[in-house]
Amino acid sequence: DCTLTITIPDNVSLNSIQADLNMGDMDVNNIHASSGDFSVDMGSLKIADSSIKNLTADNNMGDIKLTNCGSDVLNLSVDMGSLKISGMDIDKYSANLSVDLGDIKVNDSTYSHSYTNNAGSGKSINADVNMGDIKINR
C-alpha cells in the first residue's frame, strides 16, 4: 500500500493547486484555493470540507465525490463512474448537467440525460458523465 500525504497549514490559502493521479484514490480535505485542477485516470476522487473558487475535476474511470465544498465555478467530468455532490444548494448555481447513460438526481427529483438551471448568481456548475449517474443533495 503506497500513500503520499501532503499537508498544508490550516491558515494558508493557495492561489492554485493541481494534482494528477494515474491509478489509485485521491482524497483532498480542508483545502482553500482560488483554483484547483484534479485528474484521476483510474480510481476515486474525493474532495471534502474545502473551498476552491474555480474547481475542475476529471475522472476517466471511477467516481468523483464532493462533500461540503464551497466553489463558485465547477467543471466536472466523469467518463465511467458516478458524480456525487452533497452539501451544495444547487438552486444558487446556474447548472448544466448531462449524462449519456445514467440518471441525474437533484435533491428528490430524477431527470434523464440533462438538467439545466439558471440561477443568475454568477455561480455555475457544468458536469458531464458519459456512463454513470449524477447525484446532488443539499
Identify the residue ranges that each predicted region occupies.
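Right-handed parallel beta-helix
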Residues: 1-53, 65, 116-138
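Short, surface-exposed interaction patches in beta-rich subdomains
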Residues: 47-50, 54-138
